[in-house]
Curated annotation (Swiss-Prot):
Protein name: Nucleoporin Nup188
Record GO terms (molecular function): structural constituent of nuclear pore
Signal peptide: none
Record note on disruption phenotype: Lethal at the pupal stage with stronger phenotype with temperature increase. Impairs sensory dendrite tiling on the larval body. In escapers flies, leads to decreased negative geotaxis and seizures.
Top-level lineage group: Eukaryota
Family stated for the protein in its record: Belongs to the Nup188 family.
Amino acid sequence: MPAVEKSVITDWKRLWPMVSGIHYETPQDTVREELMNVASELQAGVLQFKPKNASSLELGTLLKEKKQEKLLPFTERLQDLLDLESAQCWEILCYYLTQEYRGSASLLTQLISTETNMAKLHEDIRHYYSLERMVVLKIVKNLIVFHQVPNHPYHREYRAVVEKITIPRLRDSYLDQLESLICEVPPRKLMAGECFHSAERLVAWSERNAREINEVLHILLVLAEHLPMGLEQIKRIFAACKQHSFGKMQSYLDDSQPYHQEIIRSLSYSELMLVLKCLDFEKPEKHSDLIEKLIEDLQVDIASMYHRPEHGPLLLAWMLLRLRGTNDADDASSLLRCRQLGKRAVDLKCFVQLHLIARHSMYADDSMLSRIVRRTIYNQVGYLCDLFDGDGSCARYEGIYELLCELVSWPHLAKDFCSREDDGPCSLYKTLLENFPLELTHLSKLALSLTKAGQGNYVKSQLEALPILALRYDESQHKLREVDTNEFELLASVQPFQQIDFTIPAGTSCTAIQHPSGCFMHFRFPVNYFDALHHEINCLLRETGHLHGDFESSERIRNVEAGLRFLESAVKLSQSISGISAEMVHPTEMCVDLLHTFKSVQYPPVGLLSSCLNVCTALLPLVDEEIFSRISNLHILPTVSPGSHYDFKMYANANGVGFESRFLGSVIDNVEKKRERYEFLLSYIGFLRAYSNLKRNRQIQMEIPGLIFLLKDVFPHLHTWHFSSQVERNKIYFEILSFICDILDLFNTAKESNCKQRELLVKVCVYSLLNLENGLILLRFVGVGNAYVQYTMELETNWMQQQPHGLMMLVRLSMRILMQLLRLKEEVYGNSETLSPLEALIYTQPKQRDTLRIIPTVCSYMSNIFDRWLPILSCRLLKRIALQFNMSLLACLDMEADQIRLTFMQKLPDELESDSIKIAILELVDACIAKQPGVTEAFFKVNYALDKRSRSFFSKDCVPNIGESIVTYMRDFLDALQVDPLTIQQALPAKIMTIFHSMWKHNLQMLVDDLVKDKQFWKKLCSPLFSELQPNLRIYTQLLNIISIEVYTGNGNNAALLDVMNKFFEQKNFGPWLNYVFNMPKVPAVKNLSSSDHLPDWICCLQAFKDLIVILLKKQPKFVTIPESQFKLMAQKCLVVLVDRSNYLEDMRPFIILAELYVFILLEFKHAYTDSLEEEQTLMDLLLQLMNRICACYEDQHVRAKEACLAIVTKCTHLYTDLLIRDSSIALRFLNSVVGIICSELQHMENSVSLEKSQGLNNSDSSDSKTSTNSLILCLNLLKAVATIFHNDGPGNWDLPFVSVRLFQRLVRCVSRTLPLFSKQVLSVQLLDVLIVFAKGHCSVEFLHCDVGEYLWLKLLPPRELLQSKHEFTKTTAADAEGWTVEQWWPVYARGIELVTIIYEKHKKCFLEDAFQFVGIHAVFLEDALLLSKQSLEPSAMYLIKAAVNLVASLTEHHKEWKQDSDLSLANLMRAVQSLLCHTSSLFHQQKNLKCLLAGRRSQLEILRSTEALIVDDELISACNDLTDIIISCVKALLRFSPDLMELLCCSAYEPSKHSILLDVKFGAPKLNEENLTLTFGIVLNLVNIYVKALNMQNHGFSEVPLNSLPNVEHSGDNDDPEVCVGNQTNRTFSKPLSNVSISTGTCPASELLSNMDGQLCLLALEHLLMLVASQAICIIRSPNLETLWKQIVRRDISNELLIFNEFVRRKVILDYKENRSPWLRRKHGLCKLKCVDPVRSSSSSSRSSEIVRRSNTNNELRVNVVRRLHLQQQQRTPPPQNFDMSSDLSPIAAAQGAAMTTSLDGRKRLYPAQQAGDAFLEDELAAIELQYFPPPTEPGYCELSQVQVVEEDYLQLMSALFNVMPHCD
């Protein structure tokens, strides 16, 4: 707020919390300075406020100077109301508007616009002015009271001020003020009725005047303690008090109003006690002259005052003063007059009056004022006893024992009382002892009071050995012998108490004394008080029936009740059972008997019953089980049925749980409500809370019934009950609210495993309070408002100490409960957005309907000056509301932005405000940033140029206040941080950093743009990162998070942040940071249940560091690159710490974070990051330690830890492959750990799958199953990596660990279990991938022993929901996302088929039977898979089609055996292959259809509707390549059933019956429809032309790579190097594509598509297609069964359609085609001279020759046969075994697999790469099965003049020549 210029008066309200000591946080120097500045004003008190006529300054003149003439009417009326001189009136108005007023500027204009609104504002200012005057008096009283109290924080400052003013000056000044206030009259216009609401304002003025008089009286009373009053002061005080009859004369106060009655009573008591204090001389002999003068001056006045009750104490004190201070006791007449004064005092019930004064609320605390009052009364009682109680007569005065009990219940008087012998008030106690047990009630009450005051042990020891027992004389029982007058001796022993073991022995002396009730014998024999109490209880139990319900007047009941109250205090004093004496046991046990006896009475004595229950409550800490059992058996307390009903709503509604309130409910309704006192209810609540605090976990028996009773029958209705005392009502509210707090706090305690009842209790409590019945009562307390709370506190005498059960305490408890309810709402309502009834009331919208206005009311508590906790609770409650309220908090506050800033922000820069409130405000700002943008904007608004508040509203010179914007406060924080980074350790800077963190977290950085634009911003903010690192600071986490967010969201141009990051990664900074982050405690972090999201700072810092590194790695090198040395250092330390943390897995969180960090670090390395073999060895040792530790406790690992560790191992496997291969010992340890992990995962998976099946959860998709699947998938990836590495380069026995644990069998078994489960689809795919990897390697032989067919063949059948009656494999039947669909089954089935193919390819006939079995089972589905291309060509569908056709192509190698096994399946599948080939060929011409099939069903309609030209994209090109693969496989399969081309060409005899014709011959172009499509010559020739065109458009060139090597050749020197030979070849390419010749562009795919297809695939497909065409063409031409017409058609088609192929060969293959037109002329590569040798010898002696094997498949036969028959000698070749690579297609003309490449000039990737030779076979018998050896030829070796090498182009030239010849010959 704007600061007001130096004023003529002080802002006292602001000064009070600063100097009073309530907050205990104001600096002492500030307190001294502020008080010294106003010392003169403090001395003047209320006289500093001058009346209107005290100054000649006119108000109009003043306002004219201030340029505020428009406020003149308003200010004039205010001056008339306050009766203040002009300058002070103006200052009061300014203070109110700048400090107190909470409305907006626009509202202020409205308030001064009309008379009605003006009157309301006048009243508010008048109240503010009244408070200002009262604060002055309160500060002065504080100074006097505490300036000599060492434990007050400012007592030295107070003493200095008091010494400056001096006590005498204060005394004289406040005497003047007392006289002035008593004589003061109201303002003239108020008395004349010329103001609005004059009558009400006159009453308000009178109330203020009376309160100020009372406060001045208290100040004088305290001053009298420090400086006794002299004669003149006493006379002035007496005269002033007498002037208005000791407060009775009040003109404008109504005696019929309770509040006015209380004001008058307070004045009367205060004035009376001030006079009594003045007359209290403890040593009268020292003040004899003063006493004589007082008696002389005041005797007449005082002696005449005997008409009112308040005169009684004055007469008593005056009598005692005369008797003690003069010689009146020696003069008979004077003594008689004194006795008359005493008699009048007794008749006026002076002791009753003194008791009322001592119990009054003004003196009901332990303040100095109360002590002075009680000491004064105590002294008077002592003087009276010293003078008149020699015979015990004082005990007969009415109310004297009640007064004494009240006085000695305070420690300072109780200690004095117990330290005296027989003088003073102790004589009253001696009288009680002499007459015991006649006055048992008074003795019990006195003992209780002394026990409460801390003298319990003294009292108990006294009462356990009382000296005298008084018994009514019974002639029949008491045998006495007279020894003197009234003195007797007991002749026979007497048992005074029946059924009690206590006997008075013979010989005991006694005295006979006559009492009003008869003659009593007082035996001088020790007696125990508790025996007498026991006797009284026995008598009461016997007399119960004779009382006839008249319990109120029963003396016996009063005795027992008082005795039990003392017994309760005595039991509480006992720390254990041993502290309870034997005599105390019976009275305690008989409490239960009393409860049992009186519970059945119609109107029981509730006071007695409450005392009994209180005794049981006191016994609970000692013997709780017995007490609980006995009380439960009485059935007097509420109960519920003992069944296990854990539905909290039933309990909350008391519906269906057997709830009964029992005796407690009836006694409240029938007795206590009528008496308007609720003692038994309070006792029950005390018993309930005491038992609950024992935490015996009996909530169903005790706490839940009690809570239901309180929240159903008491709390919501308590405000309608009548009470004799408001204090008792507040006490019940306090106890109930405290009990609720105890229950809600249970949620924050450590949760036990068997605490369902405790959770039920909390839920019942929360649910009940969230409902309207109880919630509305709670909101009524919260919604009281600061104005009323502060007003009630203003009326209190002691502002330094609140009433224990006052309104302010109830408001605080209610706000605390409300916070807990909002926090725990999710426990009963779940995570739903539904508002509870209580929340609906709080968040009522629109605001016009919000009558409670809870949120604005809570906000109002921010300005409370009496309770330091209310503003803090207000902020915390608003914070909770801001976090949970899903609507605008700004709308509910109903405040403008400047009002919000005034309410909250002004406290932040104020050095006089406590840190606690500042922290609460900053937490509120933090919460609003997260959820409340409107309030956040108000907090962060920094442009105040147009803000009316920032201007001087009254033209006063104002300085801008920093508190108006939190941004400025944050700027100061940054400046302080730059100066001293360690400032961040303090609480306030830490909260500011939290706000920065929240802003970045919620992307609200723009709110502090002005700060961020500063070039030094990042340097200042991040300065703590480069200072000395402090342990357990959350700000490091926040800073790292802020940097991470800025780096992630930024564009990389933040130079200032880049400088900070570069500095961070410097060695001097980064090294200590690594040490700090990786320095973690070994003990598990304790979870804080009070805040579910709270984590230890070191864990948060580690996580933030990990996030920062991960983000920087993602952003590098765009933003910053971590230096290589620091990065390696981080990697090394991270691994070391990770391995170390693996030994402390009780808390998995740090291990998980470290493991994930190391994963991301490793991902940045492409190669090993170690620099030496030693480092590499060390790293591998650490990795093996980690793996061993993981294996040791793998089942206990958290899933994230498993996944991260598996990723680490997998990545390290790739990085350190060489080491694993090189060091067999490391490899063995590594493999054993891998085996252990995978076995654990497989076992876990098998168990989980079995559990799912047993529970029928086949469609379960729980998070647990997902997590377990992820870790297993990572294990499988690790297994793939290991298999790949060791298969290629590992030792021969690397698979021994896998074989030893039967891993392959377990994998097969596991996949068989997961295949049918939809929830394990991904896992099934991964398992099959692993099986495929192993099947490709050396371990494939293990699958022959795994019963693969038994486990998998049936499991690979489609799931049941996909099987339809027609087995339509391509139609979806499970549309539900949680069930199988065909699209989800395709990848699984495709991998299953691929696995079968690979195993078959590796083992041929060993696996042939199993393969045929698979085909037999799956024939229908394989056929559907082959036909799937008509439905979909999505990636998974394409994969399935390729897998199916590859399997069929492979198995056709043994088509004869297949036909024998199942000719039907063979026929159906080959028919499907032909159909697939037809449909595939058509797709090249139907690109839109192809696009639809690729897009899937969801997007097909959009593609079909589109009228735009189809764009050839990567997807389409890739699909055509896949279709080419499919075509190759289809042709391979068909070639098995087509005649061998070489046989057709070379065999002398042709047998047409052995072969069938596969291609149909039809006229015309191929049909484009898909119905009844048959494979024709036209389709195949069309495909040939498509691929020729593709090769042509790609300018395909041949590199002339030899496909064979020449044996038995003497190489010349020039040809020794094969590379030289190849390098001399001509590499021919053409820059211009050939014409299409016979293929029109309309019958061929788009040129763009063809030109981008894979050239190698096109060539491979062309080779296969050419062989099929040639074979079938010759077969047809030579067939005797076909007509000549059809043969002619074939010749014509070949002649016409293959013209483009022939042209392609002529241009690209034939040597010098332009000059040499002969198609038979070919190049001769590797021309060498022949050396005829013995083939057998050459095969064994030549070390350079390679061996050629003829495998069972015929893919390679054409080229090999051609070469063998025409150019090469037949030789036996034995190729080495190799991996079967499904990605490589075998060309029908490919070289032998063992042939090595001899050139590096081949620019294109070959699909049949050469493999390295030299690998050994797995087993000899398998090698024998796989290879068929041909015997050496018997004919002599073929010999020519020269031999040449065969190249790829030779095949094309041969086929071209063949097709050129074919049309012209038969």
